[in-house]
Amino acid sequence: IASIGAALQDPSKIIGIHFFNPAPLMPLVEIIPAVQTSEETLNISRSLIDGWGKVTVLCKDTPGFIVNRVARPFYGEALRIYEEGIADFATIDWAMTSIGGFRMGPFTLMDYIGNDINYTVTETVFTAFYFDPRYKPSFTQKRHSEAGYLGRKSGRGYFDYREGAANPKPIEDAVVGQQIFDRILVMLINEAVDAVFLNIGSKDEIDLAMTKGVNYPKGLLKWADEIGLENVLLKLEAMFAEYGEDRYRPSPLMRRMVKNGERFFE
């Protein structure tokens, strides 16, 4: 947003406004002031959008804003689980919907969004964060995109949408399903906690953004309180020790809160 504002005669009037698809139906709008944005521009913009009956959240001018930053592991970790041979697309989606309560599994959602679009967003975020391994793109998604398996719009993606096509059924193993759900959830929570740590948004607005912007069954920080931050930290530390990859590093705020026995909400 700041780079766009730099080209204006009056940069104080620049502000980012991010709707969610489909915009007439999805209630959330992210409002992103740049470093040049005046208080007047921010207040007028928020008042206008509130007047449309939208739910607004304020976030820092960083890659992905709140939602597209925090949601990366929903796709990235699901792809990683598939690449490790732990489960197929259908089983991972089953785990996230039937056990996790999400409206769509990650592969169904990526097919809905379009693999070309979702991959491009991931690649852009990865580059913008100076190649932080937490946002590393997947070769599986890259190859699907290159093959033209873009999802619903092309008739094929992770699933086959052509008339008469038969897709594999999930393996409904409760133990494996719980492991899949737990792994993706703790990664999502870690991103949400880190967004608080880096002042990307307030804890209330981060939880609001994820429930109203991408229909998560509950806010991730509230979820962390319910599970227990200490349990989330244990799972992340176990993955970090097993893989030795920086993508699994726990947020410093999580470590601090566990050490002090703190919660996000009372």
Located regions from the model:
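N-terminal glycine-rich phosphate-binding loop for ADP-containing cofactors
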Residues: 1-266
